[in-house]
Amino acid sequence: MKGDKPEEPGPGPEPSGPPPPTEEEEALLEFHRSYRELFEFFCNNTTIHGAIRLVCSQHNRMKTVFWAVLWLCTFGMMYWQFGQLFGEYFSYPVSLNINLNSDKLVFPAVSICTLNPYRYKEIQEELEELDRITEQTLFDLYKYNSSKTLVAHARSRRDLREPLPHPLQRLPVPAPPHAARGVRRAGSSMRDNNPQVNRKDWKIGFQLCNQNKSDCFYQTYSSGVDAVREWYRFHYINILSRRRQDTSPSLEEDVLGKFIFTCRFNQDSCNEANYSHFHHPMYGNCYTFNDKNSSNLWMSSMPGVNNGLSLTLRTEQNDFIPLLSTVTGARVMVHERDEPAFMDDAGFNLRPGVETSISMSKEAVDRLGGDYGDCTKNGSEVPVENLYNTKYTQQVCIHSCFQESMIKECGCAYIFYPRPDGVEFCDYRKHNSWGYCYYKLQDAFSSDRLGCFTKCRKPCSVTIYKLSASYSQWPSATSQDWVFQMLSRQNNYTIKNKRDGVAKLNIFFKELNYKSNSESPSVTMVTLLSNLGSQWSLWFGSSVLSVVEMAELIIDLLVITFLMLLRRFRSRYWSPGRGGKGTQEVASTPAASLPSSFCPHPAFFSSSPPDPAISPALSAPPPAYATLGPHPAPSGLAEASTSAHAPGEP
């Protein structure tokens, strides 16, 4: 009560410490004692559907087996679907996205060539010998008399030097048996579809040999026209190679007005800042409008024929090389501003006396590289040097690859492609076997044995201009007189053959809408995880935490297996009584390892009599189990034991 003095604690036993933890209390880290216990715990507590049925039906073996089989089949189906999803992801599929855009468009570059290789007056002396031998060859093979041509006039001027190497020849082909003749023509690799003179069974060609003349072959053609043109072209390249290495300014420069009478873009006249000049070995003088070096960037803000490039061209052929160029007109190509013009690959010809209107539509393609596609962004990883020093394109790479092979195998550069510094163009006066090497290399290139088409990958970003052309006669019969009169007075030039002397070209956008095609990954990591989660929920109706439970089960299985193996290993190899089949296990335990409660009290060994209140059974240590078994005693102890027995006792 209040006011009472607190009771003083009397003498008594001292308070003991906190009780030691019992086995039932949960430890910080513990594991199940058996697989069965672990499995029952997992099935009773997991959130995966169907697992608890394996425990609830344990008293009905048939249901247990049914649910176990169903659970395993469901598990297998789910992981089969997982394999399908991972296979789809690692195949790196792409989706094509098509967008339609509308904006002002940058006008592309337009390259146009005369279709007229270097004129007679520029390289007349170099071509006389070639023309004479070609004339004689045509007469021998086809009885063609060109006495009225310019070549005949040149031949009467002076005697020429030694004959050219690699003469053109007529080569007979052995006739097959009559029964197999139809089969040969049907399945032969020869160019039997080409026209043949008098239907003779021969071929036209010229012989090419290697450096030491140990290997030779004939470059042959079933068409005489093709053979003559190719043979003339081969020698023309040699002549041109000598001039290209020592080019005079008069040969490289040409007046724009000699080829292009009028030029307008968006109704404004062109000037010298809008074009650049280059030479093509076969197409002569070429001009590129609106290339990357132009000072003014041409833009199209309106579609239609009046909002593009309009050119009036001179297409007369009075000074053409007839044995090299068999067509008249002009050649045009549309390409990107920072790409070179490959007139052989993508150009097309314009017809004289015709107005050609070309409408364009732009299309941009953006591909995915890396694992999603075999394309390159800038060609830096392509093992081919860009000899054009321009933007990477597949054609740039392919031509550079062939030129590298040409320099490596033949020791000289092909005149149609750029050459590295310090390398000469091929000329049989310096490289007498380059023709043999070139045609062999060309055959390997066509069949991709050089690997150029494999090395040169597509660019990831490409701009394509789709062209559609329409044609009409120009000028008309009623207007041609005043048109030709104006052109002649304006350009101080007399057009001899009016209809075949001019051509008109219009290039424009037919619409400002352009299509962009871009690739994107069809299956991203987010999509993959979503699909995996959907499959997991479909087959087990669980979530990510259920996956963690499965991982925990696997870890527990591994730990329990490890502990069981460790226990078995210790019992087999670390047991102290291992030598006596386990009978010496307790007997061999040292006294120091026994608990203190099993050790005798120190007073037990004192000289004073023992306290009768203390039971000997409680104070004595437990006997060693090994001593309970029979084994011989020491001799001294045996005698003492015998003397202690009373007489007559057993």
From Swiss-Prot:
Membrane-topology annotation of the record: Multi-pass membrane protein
Site residues, Cleavage by Furin: R158, D159, R184, R185
Disulfide bonds: C113-C286, C209-C216, C263-C270, C375-C460, C397-C437, C397-C456, C401-C452, C410-C437, C410-C460, C412-C426
Region (Disordered): 1-25, 165-194, 614-650
Compartments, record wording: Apical cell membrane; Cell projection, Cilium; Cytoplasmic granule; Cytoplasm
Keyword DNA-binding: no
GO biological process, one term: cellular response to acidic pH
Keywords: Cell membrane, Cell projection, Cilium, Cytoplasm, Cytoplasmic vesicle, Disulfide bond, Flagellum, Glycoprotein, Ion channel, Ion transport, Membrane, Sodium, Sodium channel, Sodium transport, Transmembrane, Transmembrane helix, Transport, Ubl conjugation
GO cellular component terms attached to this protein's record: acrosomal vesicle; apical plasma membrane; ciliary membrane; cytoplasm; cytosol; external side of plasma membrane; extracellular exosome; motile cilium
GO molecular function: ligand-gated sodium channel activity; WW domain binding
Tissue-wise expression: Expressed in kidney and lung (at protein level).
Ranges of the Cytoplasmic topological domain: 1-65, 565-650
Principal place of residence: membrane
Means of activity regulation: Originally identified and characterized by its inhibition by the diuretic drug amiloride.
TM helices/strands, residue ranges: 66-86, 544-564
Residue stretches of biased makeup (Pro residues): 9-21, 614-624
Protein name as it appears in the record: Epithelial sodium channel subunit alpha
Record's subunit section: Heterotrimer; containing an alpha/SCNN1A, a beta/SCNN1B and a gamma/SCNN1G subunit. Interacts with WWP1 (via WW domains). Interacts with WWP2 (via WW domains); inhibits the channel. Interacts with BPIFA1; the interaction is indirect via SCNN1B and inhibits the proteolytic processing of SCNN1A and SCNN1G and the activation of ENaC. Interacts with the full-length immature form of PCSK9 (pro-PCSK9).
Record-stated family: Belongs to the amiloride-sensitive sodium channel (TC 1.A.6) family. SCNN1A subfamily.
Region (Gating release of inhibition by proteolysis (GRIP)): 155-223
Residues that carry a glycan: N145
Reactions performed catalytically: Na(+)(in) = Na(+)(out)
Position of sequence motif PY motif: 621-625
Membrane-side (Extracellular) residue stretches: 87-543
Gene: SCNN1A
